Each structure stands twice: as C-alpha cells, then as structure tokens.
Amino acid sequence: MSFPYFISPEQAMRERSELARKGIARGRSVIALAYADGVLFVAENPSRSLQKVSELYDRVGFAAVGRFNEFNNLRSGGIRFADTQGYAYSRRDVTGRQLANVYAQTLGTIFTEQAKPYEVELCVAEVAHYGETKAPELYRITYDGSIADEPHFVVMGGTTEPIATALNESYAENASLEDAVRIAVAALGAGGNGAEPRTLGPSTLEVAILDANRPRRAFRRITGAALEALLPQADTKDDSQDSEGAAEPDA
C-alpha cells in the first residue's frame, strides 16, 4: 500500500523561500539611496531595453531585481493602479506607501497561494511634492510580501552583503548628486565575486533619479554624456585603459 506524498506547511514555506532567494541572488544588484535633492537609483544593468528602474507616478519611482517578466508585470500593475487612483481622486492621493502596501499584499498572496512564488524584490521610493520639505521615503518589499521602511538606502540582488557594508562605511546624508553617484557606483563595484573591486562604466549602469526640485514628474533618467560627467574620473580612465589592453571581465 502506497501512502500519498506529504510535506509539512513549514517545509513548503522554507522551500518556497529558498527558491525565491536563489532567484533574486542570481540577478545583478540595484541600489536606491536618498541624497540632498531626492532619491538616486543605480542598477548594474548592461541591457538598454530591459530596465530595472522606472517611474510609477508623479513623485514615485520603482526598482526591482529578479525575474524580469515577474517584476515587469508588477510594475505595469502598479502604474495602472496609480493612474486609476489619481484619476478617481487626486494625483496627490497617490503615495509611495500606498503602492508599497499594494505590492506587499500582492506578493504575500502569490507566496502563500500560488504554486511558485515570485522571484523578485522591489523598492518603491517617493519624494516630496514640489515646494514642500519632506525626507524621501524608501520601501523594500520582499518576495513573501514583507515590507520595510528604509531610512537611507536599499540594496537588492546579487551579493548584497559587501555592497551594504560599503554603503554603511561611505554613505553621507544630504550628499550632492555627484557624490551620491560616486558612493553608489563604488559600492556596486565592491559586490563582485572577486577580491578586487570592479570598475563599472556607463555601458553597464542604469541610473535615474527622483528629483524633488522638478515641478510635477520627479523621475528622470541619466544617460550618455550626463552620466559620464557624474562618474568618477578614475573610473572613466580605467575603462579606456581596459578597452586598449586586456579584455574586460563579464558584466
């Protein structure tokens, strides 16, 4: 007589968590950090079409790591929700906390009820409305629907521990945009598998900001010459030397 296969709920949750964590760790890292004029997003992303960072609404931004199709579905759903709320009520009624709670509820339901959890981790950020003074808000939402309010920065994906350690040592409140980019890029470079820090150039970075000084839509991407001007000069020099000498390592 054969007995039906049984797995305890605790074991099932552990296996789901392990699956999601492994999927998230395979992705390249993303940093979101508060600076003097808003929030800076820096993602290690060589793709120009599959973006990890985007706008959700006027003063709200989004960053994610993990499976692209899964977090892109969440991003699209968040945009639709925000547009509906803003149209039905007021644009000012759409907040980062509201969207973070929606994502937390959605991911929590998927984690407990569906056959496979989403292998994603999200960050929702919000800056003050134009002319107002309020500290940026950063929310981390994990694969199981857990939500945390982070005061200064969020690190997701890849090898987060060395990156978080580097940020704890170098992060400065109310830093300028140039200093914030330098801090974030240096921290990302510390997250490689090798012992030596990596050099990351414009071709491997996706950078955007939520600028509280912009009147309505705070989100802005930084690309091309504008990004090169913000990167440390030493990094730019190293990139040119690498291109003339030995082949660069994989991104």
From Swiss-Prot:
Pfam families: Proteasome
Function, in words: Component of the proteasome core, a large protease complex with broad specificity involved in protein degradation.
GO biological process: modification-dependent protein catabolic process; proteasomal protein catabolic process
Pathway: Protein degradation; proteasomal Pup-dependent pathway
Signal peptide stretch: none
Stored NCBIfam families: 20S_bact_alpha (TIGR03691)
HAMAP family found in the cross-reference section: Proteasome_A_B
Entry keyword Cytoplasm: yes
Gene that this polypeptide is encoded by: prcA
Record's GO cellular component terms: cytoplasm; proteasome core complex, alpha-subunit complex
Domain of life: Bacteria
Keyword Phosphoprotein: no
PROSITE patterns per record: PROTEASOME_ALPHA_2
Primary location recorded for the protein, binned into one broad class: cytoplasm
Organism: Mycolicibacterium gilvum (strain PYR-GCK) (Mycobacterium gilvum (strain PYR-GCK))
Annotated region (Disordered), positions in chain: 230-251
Record keywords: Cytoplasm, Proteasome
Family of the protein in this entry: Belongs to the peptidase T1A family.
One Gene Ontology MF term: threonine-type endopeptidase activity
Oligomeric and partner information: The 20S proteasome core is composed of 14 alpha and 14 beta subunits that assemble into four stacked heptameric rings, resulting in a barrel-shaped structure. The two inner rings, each composed of seven catalytic beta subunits, are sandwiched by two outer rings, each composed of seven alpha subunits. The catalytic chamber with the active sites is on the inside of the barrel. Has a gated structure, the ends of the cylinder being occluded by the N-termini of the alpha-subunits. Is capped by the proteasome-associated ATPase, ARC.
Name this polypeptide is given: Proteasome subunit alpha
Record comment: activity regulation: The formation of the proteasomal ATPase ARC-20S proteasome complex, likely via the docking of the C-termini of ARC into the intersubunit pockets in the alpha-rings, may trigger opening of the gate for substrate entry. Interconversion between the open-gate and close-gate conformations leads to a dynamic regulation of the 20S proteasome proteolysis activity.
Compartment(s): Cytoplasm
Listed Acidic residues bias regions: 241-251
